[in-house]
Amino acid sequence: MKEKEIQENMNKSIEATQRNFNTIRTGRANASLLDRVSVDYYGAETPIKSLATISTIDSQTISIQPFDISCLQAIEKSISMSDLGITPNNDGKVIRINVPPLTEERRKEFCKLASKYAEEGKVALRNIRRDAVDKEKKDEKDGLISIDESRDNQSEIQKITDKYIALIETKLSEKEKEILKV
């Protein structure tokens, strides 16, 4: 694996981890909160953002305006059944969600969830590293590169991995601060 390819794969893992972090509720209303909620729309699981305009009215309220009014009940049901712990209010045209402030216990649960997502991201990075190191060892065994080149490349791969793991740790720290901020 080339260094550029390794970094591209690791960047994808970082982006996936960030998307997971974005779905964790903080004390503020955020449209990305609903990214993981999908609606059973004509027999197909469809993301809410494909069915409606989602906007934040203020720091505590999210507004969902469906493109097709007939899917209003389905959207409301999907939000109610999600693990977000929020209750939608349907006025017949728009769904409003009041995001209540988080309790201390709920904040700790979300911090644990953020840690879990960070760990999944680190595991993905380590898997990329393992694949790259295995390729280096195979190339060395096949005589395509020298032992010294292989060791240098493996050392470089480890440095890249350490850099990306530190980036995940930084993002986790930022997310935990955001969650714990009252």
Curated annotation (Swiss-Prot):
Compartments reported by the entry: Cytoplasm
Entry keyword set: Cytoplasm, Protein biosynthesis
CDD domains assigned to the protein according to its UniProt record, in alphabetical order: RRF
Domain of life: Bacteria
GO cellular component terms listed in the entry, alphabetical order: cytoplasm
Record Gene3D superfamilies: 3.30.1360.40, Ribosome-recycling factor
Functional description taken from the UniProt entry: Responsible for the release of ribosomes from messenger RNA at the termination of protein biosynthesis. May increase the efficiency of translation by recycling ribosomes from one round of translation to another.
NCBIfam families with a match to the protein in the record: frr
PANTHER family, alphabetized: MITOCHONDRIAL RIBOSOME RECYCLING FACTOR PSEUDO 1, RIBOSOME RECYCLING FACTOR
Protein's recorded name: Ribosome-recycling factor
Source species taxonomy: Bacteria, Bacillati, Cyanobacteriota, Cyanophyceae, Synechococcales
